[in-house]
Design a protein with these regions (language model features):
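Terminal, low-structured helical/coil segments at or just beyond the last alpha-helical repeat
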Residues: 3, 71-91
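Short coil turns that delineate tetratricopeptide repeat
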Residues: 32, 65-66
Length: 91
């Protein structure tokens, strides 16, 4: 599975978001409760400015692994939304 994580990270760094998303979704079909895959799914959502999708993925990742880097990523998105969309976002 580590190879999959590394491949997804490389695809994201190369700007190949669609390919990264396909791979993550394919793997989530097999292992739906993988916190790292969910974290990566959240990163893909954030890269696309799909804030709700990113938050959903990060929340699921944190539920599965409270020490996941998704916790910090989720907090960063919440801060972005609170700053730019005060009228839409009220935590």
């Amino acid at each position: 599975m580590q190879q999959t994580y590394d491949t997804v990270r490389q695809l994201l760094e190369a700007g190949k978001t669609a390919e990264a998303e396909r791979l993550v979704l394919q793997e989530l079909e097999v292992v739906p409760n993988d916190a790292t895959l969910l974290y990566l799914q959240g990163r893909i959502g954030a890269k696309r400015a799909d804030w709700q999708g990113a938050l959903n993925a990060f929340n699921r990742a944190v539920q599965l692994d409270p020490d996941s880097p998704a916790r910090e990523a989720r907090q960063a998105i919440e801060e972005i939304l609170a700053f730019y969309h005060k009228d839409y976002y009220n935590p």
